[in-house]
Every structure is written in structure tokens, then in C-alpha cells.
Swiss-Prot record:
Changing L113A: Reduces transcriptional activation activity. Residues 217-248 are annotated as: Disordered. Changing S24P: In strain: CLIB 219. This is General control transcription factor GCN4. Its main location: nucleus. One of its GO terms (molecular function) is mediator complex binding. PROSITE patterns: BZIP (PS50217), BZIP_BASIC (PS00036).
Length: 281
């Protein structure tokens, strides 16, 4: 390439500038001649170098932008012909919404309510008279229900009686005594009757039937060598020995009681005989 021949990359062969694809080369000639003309041997990459003098590439920085946060006083309609005024909010309403106090509610005012609290209407009916007779009837009803262990299903509660209330109109009630709840387990008194007397033996205690075995018990032989079966056999044999020892002890105690009773009988007879001799002298 000679030094007098301009660069082929400086101009687009299609007739468009590399900076603007919608405009032709003829329209950009006047703009390019006013800014900077391409020199001989200049490549196409030099066209994309950003310079401070290029007004097309220069952009506004964020420092040049101004943001206006003020609320507009008017609003324009979509047709841009009429201007609609925006209503201003009351300062008291704004402060009530953004207040940090948890005791106040922005939608209601409690100053007027607190002053006239005595004039409020009661939610309950205070005109019902409560007398001491009503409370005494209620106490008796409570005592009767506590004394009965099993309440029948068809029991009807009287609707005319009143429960005791803390506020009484006639008089102040004395403190009611505490009612002791009966124990769930009631000990039954054992009365000795004819049936019980018939079950007593000659020693004055309850008789029991002693089973007399004609054949002694067979020895326990484990069925297998299973450890559980062996342990079960040993436990059964130990229980038999324990019952045998208990029966032997009971037999010995009965014999001892009979011996003591016979001695007591002889001693009483001896005392009676001696008293008789002393009385004769």
C-alpha cells in the first residue's frame, strides 16, 4: 500500500459508517470532516478509541444526575391537558402511623374513653340479687355431691339455685368450712355373725381345709436340656419345698397353741381350787 493511497478499512465498502448502521456514508462525511479526518495508514480499530473530544461517545455520569424526591403537588392526566390536584395528608395522621409508641392506636383515640370510663355500660347483669340463702343452698348441694361416691346419670341440677359470688348485697358471709373429701377406698367393718362363727375352729381362728395327699408328688424331671426348662423345673421344686416348710411351721404353731391352751386351762382350775380352799378357812 502506497503512502498516498488511503486505507481501505477507513471507509465501509457497503456505504455505511462503522459507528452508525442506519446512516449512509454521504451523511457521515460532513460530521467526520468536522471532528477528525482519518490519516494515511489508519486502521479501522482507531475509530473505536474513546476520546474526550468525541461528543457521540461522551455520556453523563451519575454525578450530573439530579434526583428530586419531593412529592409533586399536582398530577397530570394521561391526555396532558388537565391538571389534577393531589390531596395533602394531615400531619396528625402521618405522625400517628409512624409513631413508635405501642400504647396508642392511630385509628382510635383513647383520651375521651378514659375520662368517661364510669359511664360505660356493663357487659353483665348486676341487677340479679344474691342472698345468703342462695349461697347456703349451694353449699349444701356441694356437700351432698361430695358425699355421694356414685352420681346417677339421671340426676338433674336445679337451675334456681345460685353459686356463691364474691359480691353479696344482703350481708357478708362467713368463711365456709372446708369439706373433707371421703377416701375412695372405704374400709368395711367386719361384723362377726353366725356364718363367721361356723368357720372358726376349736382354736378360735378361721379354719382352712388342709388337703391330705395319699400319694406324694412326683419328682420334677426336665423335659429337655433347654436352659429355660431347667430353670422352670428348679423354680417349681423350690416352690414345693417352700410350701412344705410353711405347712410344717403352721402345724407346729397349731400344736403349740393347743399345748398353751391346755396349760392355761389347768392353771385356771388350780387357781379356782386354791381360792376355794382359802375361802373355806
Amino acid at each position: 500500500m502506497s503512502e498516498y493511497q488511503p486505507s481501505l478499512f477507513a471507509l465501509n465498502p457497503m456505504g455505511f459508517s462503522p459507528l452508525d448502521g442506519s446512516k449512509s456514508t454521504n451523511e457521515n462525511v460532513s460530521a467526520s470532516t468536522s471532528t477528525a479526518k482519518p490519516m494515511v495508514g489508519q486502521l479501522i480499530f482507531d475509530k473505536f478509541i474513546k476520546t474526550e473530544e468525541d461528543p457521540i461517545i461522551k455520556q453523563d455520569t451519575p454525578s450530573n444526575l439530579d434526583f428530586d424526591f419531593a412529592l409533586p403537588q399536582t398530577a397530570t392526566a394521561p391526555d396532558a391537558k388537565t391538571v389534577l390536584p393531589i390531596p395533602e395528608l394531615d400531619d396528625a395522621v402521618v405522625e400517628s402511623f409512624f409513631s413508635s409508641s405501642t400504647d396508642s392506636t392511630p385509628m382510635f383515640e383513647y383520651e375521651n374513653l378514659e375520662d368517661n370510663s364510669k359511664e360505660w355500660t356493663s357487659l353483665f347483669d348486676n341487677d340479679i340479687p344474691v342472698t345468703t340463702d342462695d349461697v347456703s343452698l349451694a353449699d349444701k348441694a356441694i356437700e351432698s355431691t361430695e358425699e355421694v361416691s356414685l352420681v346417677p346419670s339421671n340426676l338433674e341440677v336445679s337451675t334456681t339455685s345460685f353459686l356463691p359470688t364474691p359480691v353479696l348485697e344482703d350481708a357478708k358471709l362467713t368463711q365456709t368450712r372446708k369439706v373433707k373429701k371421703p377416701n375412695s377406698v372405704v374400709k368395711k367393718s367386719h361384723h362377726v355373725g353366725k356364718d363367721d362363727e361356723s368357720r372358726l375352729d376349736h382354736l378360735g381362728v378361721v379354719a382352712y381345709n388342709r388337703k391330705q395327699r395319699s400319694i406324694p408328688l412326683s419328682p420334677i424331671v426336665p423335659e429337655s436340656s433347654d436352659p429355660a426348662a431347667l430353670k422352670r423345673a428348679r423354680n417349681t421344686e423350690a416352690a414345693r419345698r417352700s410350701r412344705a416348710r410353711k405347712l410344717q411351721r403352721m402345724k407346729q404353731l397349731e400344736d403349740k397353741v393347743e399345748e398353751l391352751l391346755s396349760k392355761n386351762y389347768h392353771l385356771e382350775n388350780e387357781v379356782a381350787r386354791l381360792k376355794k380352799l382359802v375361802g373355806e378357812r
